[in-house]
Amino acid sequence: ARATIQVYEETAGLMVNDPVLRTRKPLSVELGPGILGNIFDGIQRPLKTIAIKSGDVYIPRGVSVPALDKDVLWEFQPTKLGVGDVITGGDLYATVFENTLMQHHVALPPGSMGKISYIAPAGQYNLQDTVLELEFQGIKKKFTMLQTWPVRSPRPVASKLAADTPLLTGQRVLDALFPSVLGGTCAIPGAFGCGKTVISQALSKYSNSEAVVYVGCGERGNEMAEVLMDFPQLTMTLPDGREESVMKRTTLVANTSNMPVAAREASIYTGITIAEYFRDMGYNVSMMADSTSRWAEALREISGRLAEMPADSGYPAYLAARLASFYERAGKVKCLGSPDRNGSVTIVGAVSPPGGDFSDPVTSATLSIVQVFWGLDKKLAQRKHFPSVNWLISYSKYSKALESFYEKFDPDFIDIRTKAREVLQREDDLNEIVQLVGKDALAESDKITLETAKLLREDYLAQNAFTPYDKFCPFYKSVWMMRNIIHFNTLANQAVERAAGTDGHKITYSVIKHRLGDLFYRLVSQKFEDPAEGEEALVGKFKKLYDDLTTGFRNLEDEAR
């Protein structure tokens, strides 16, 4: 029997007849306390530790460092389980204080079971200390807080559940028009310079997930360096008002384009396995893969080395199957073991098709799998409209699943969103006419539609990720901003129609613009309201604007009669 082995590093030291030993297990990762706040490469080597040990900016050849530090002491707190209790795989038997943001639950590895013959008392232990001993059919087995898991096999769950909670990202265009769910699959395809990485980073910083795994897979080294510089300085505000570092809930898997191809192919699996580990504790985890195109290119390169038959564009024939097997590890699940708990993994994959061509094999295979498509547009990016999500081609198949959430949050929201979509679609239809005959030849209602669409485009969908007031937009602010813009559209159309049927002065779009300029300015300025002032203050301001719009138009109609 022959085995083909791709060597991970320089092969200069090897020669014929050198012995090759099997590790007797597939590529596995170490899972335990200490993962959060760490940065690994594609095969889970800790890059910080390597940098300190080697004192070099590059990873030296042949360096081998354990993924998790085995000597750090962790505060171990067992649950109510005691000696003589029976426990099975997935049961949580202790908690470990990981950091002020995350409580780390220690579970029995899947596939193990038995009667507890020893459980460590509360205290400080490292990852080599035995904290649990089980007896099953007369055989005793010891467990530490550390477990290993092969990256290519999904971790088992009790059952899959239907997702019904939205993934709130803080980006208005995504939350309002194309929402995803906790446990969803999203794709962000876009050409270079469209802002894929900024959207991925915004998701990592501000989304309502409890843990984030960010996989930089084959992207430029300076992008990962930027993430490494930014994330430790970023803070998130907790419901009780505390400021905590985003790094405390984040794990980075950095695999830049100058690292070996084999690790690039493995890095996505490493990331998803770490995400599943936190999901099994009952957390909602989101995983960003930036970018799956580079991962597919690594597959293509390895497939070429193995002399497999190439398919479309040189990619292997099993590309779609590999992508599907990765994306299907997302989802909301009922976790194994007791206590009863639900967790979820949301996957957001950035795709960078060459030249922004969406018919590329990786993009088309991804779009047939994922449920949410946030399509980035080069033209919008060139107009400096960010996030450059094209609202005409993007879609979300989760709108139906989230209806019950929206009904509870705000019963009017679904109608408002439908109207906003209609306005944006109508604007696209009118643009051709405007280019032929100019704006003045349009009907008054069409002029109002164009103005509303401009408000939606420039002051609602566009969002500046580098300002304190707009870097994160809470959902209540998104809803109220959209409500006021659509309210303006409805009132303006009503005013024009009513005045047309009377003998008084006609109300035209230019009259509205001239007479209600101050209200118009306030509509444009809604985005400058800072969420730091608190929900009550902001909703009060938005309600006042809503009432002022109603009053302003009523007065205008009275004068026209």
Curated annotation (Swiss-Prot):
Residues the record lists as binding ATP: 190-197
EC id: 7.1.2.2
Keyword line: ATP-binding, Hydrogen ion transport, Ion transport, Nucleotide-binding, Translocase, Transport
Superkingdom per UniProt: Eukaryota
GO biological-process terms attached to the record: ATP metabolic process; proton transmembrane transport
Organs and tissues of expression: High expression in the mesocotyl tip of etiolated seedlings compared to the base.
Reactions it catalyzes: ATP + H2O + 4 H(+)(in) = ADP + phosphate + 5 H(+)(out)
Cellular component, GO annotation: plant-type vacuole; proton-transporting V-type ATPase, V1 domain
Subunit structure: V-ATPase is a heteromultimeric enzyme composed of a peripheral catalytic V1 complex (main components: subunits A, B, C, D, E, and F) attached to an integral membrane V0 proton pore complex (main component: the proteolipid protein).
The family this protein is said to belong to: Belongs to the ATPase alpha/beta chains family.
Functional description taken from the UniProt entry: Catalytic subunit of the peripheral V1 complex of vacuolar ATPase. V-ATPase vacuolar ATPase is responsible for acidifying a variety of intracellular compartments in eukaryotic cells.
Protein name (database record): V-type proton ATPase catalytic subunit A
Record organism: Zea mays (Maize)
